[in-house]
Amino acid sequence: MGARASQEPRTRVRAGLRVLLPVLLLALLLLALVAPGAQGARGRGAADKNSHRRATSSFSQSVSSLFGEDNVRAAQKLLSRLTERFVQGVDMFLETLWKVWMELLEVLGLDVSNLSQYFSPASVSNSPTRALVLVGVVLLAYWFLSLTLGFTFSLLHLVFGRFFWLVRVILFSMSCVYILHKYEGEPEHAVLPLCVVVAIYFMTGPMGYWRGSPGGLCSPSVEEKLEHLENQVRLLNIRLNRVLENLDRSKDK
């Protein structure tokens, strides 16, 4: 009991860091996206641009003087290459998933070349069959997405164990980098994908069903087992006290 009470502040701090770190990262990304648009919309003059450039140049000069200009350039080249390869790998992965999804739709007898006909309001209202097909496609897409995410994150949780939260933060950061790289010229279009990534991040957190033990997706976690054991110990103490009280009463009589 005492050991667990001493560990409660640590677990709270860790949980707070797990939530605070991605939130801060998302806030920085949103500021980086919104700030240029807000400055352009408000019509700020050249003084703001010059101040921004001065701050950027001073920061780059300080970093170059600290680590060396050659090292900074080498690090920039390495990061750019890693980012490009990462984006290419994610594109290949998404393309593979899209091909699998198209094959599933073809197996169901849907016209993959013209999917827009199933989503038009006129065709849905005129043909109830298409409405049923549309509902089936949406449910199938939800099932396919949930199955993919569930299998991926349950495998990661099984492999990394306690460090799964760190893997989640890294994947969250890499997803944000991918989205910002894809929408580099159109930052306003990156807001919705970033929100989707944030939603997936919190869905795969402590409230997600794949945060359970490896024995099953719906099995109780370690904290629930500890709480159950505490309740059992309390019940045993209560029963033991009652037995001792009954023994004392019998002796007094």
Curated annotation (Swiss-Prot):
InterPro entries: BRI3BP. Residues 219-253 form a coiled coil. Keywords: Coiled coil, Membrane, Mitochondrion, Mitochondrion outer membrane, Phosphoprotein, Proto-oncogene, Transmembrane, Transmembrane helix. It is found in: Mitochondrion outer membrane. Signal peptide: none annotated. The chain crosses the membrane at residues 19-39, 131-151, 164-181, 190-210. Its main location: mitochondrion. The modification Phosphoserine is found at residue 250. It is a multi-pass membrane protein. GO terms for cellular component: mitochondrial outer membrane. It holds the Pfam family BRI3BP. Interacts with LETMD1. Interacts with BRI3. Interacts with BRI3; the interaction is weak. Interacts with TMEM238L. PANTHER family: BRI3-BINDING PROTEIN. Involved in tumorigenesis and may function by stabilizing p53/TP53. This is BRI3-binding protein. It comes from Mus musculus.
